[in-house]
Amino acid sequence: MDNSHDISVLNTLIATTLDSMKGYRESAEDSENSTHAQFFREMAEERSQVASDLQQQVRSLGGDPEMDSSTAGAAHRGWVDLKAAITGHDEQAVVNEVERGEDYIKGKFETAMQDDELSPAARGAIEKCFESIRKGHDRASQMKHAMADVD
């Protein structure tokens, strides 16, 4: 059985998840709010675990898992760094960028789950990991809206 499509889809999600992990780590460093920084560190760890789970699935399919983030993710982190420099690490700007990143990764996983060419094993692994992605998205969204309510 040719697993190349599954491996390709999974590796794309791995790169996106590693982007997210790195983004959370950088957001934790940029945050001046200890509660937010702790949330960002927790999410970085969760994303590291999701990437590890997906990498294991690629190995089980006989593939070489992606071990690094994407070029697009590096560009986004560069934009976040530039925006932080311009806004002076404004907490609202950091949280807004985190939520934007969450919208992106959630969309990537949702698109992958709609892929009719995926094997049941790959789909199952993606769906399992999506639970963490969805929860992270919802928490980031709640954080953003809570900050907006305070303003």
What are these regions (language model features)?
Residues 6-13, 34-53, 91-97, 121-133:
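Alpha-helical scaffold segments that form or flank carboxylate-/histidine-based iron centers
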Residues 94, 98-151:
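Preference for long, well-ordered alpha-helical segments
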Residues 24-31, 58-61, 86, 113-116, ...:
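Secondary-structure edge/capping motif, primarily at the C-terminal ends of alpha-helices
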Residues 38, 45, 65-82, 122-132, ...:
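Charge-rich, acidic-biased intrinsically disordered regions
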Residues 2-31, 93-117:
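Alpha-helical bundle segments that constitute or directly flank the non-heme di-iron/ferroxidase center
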Residues 13, 20, 27, 50, ...:
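Amphipathic alpha-helices that form helix-helix packing interfaces
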Residues 35-73, 140-144:
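Conserved alpha-helical segments that form or flank metal/cofactor-binding pockets of metalloenzymes
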Residues 56-106:
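Carboxylate-rich helix-loop segments that flank metal/cofactor sites and access channels
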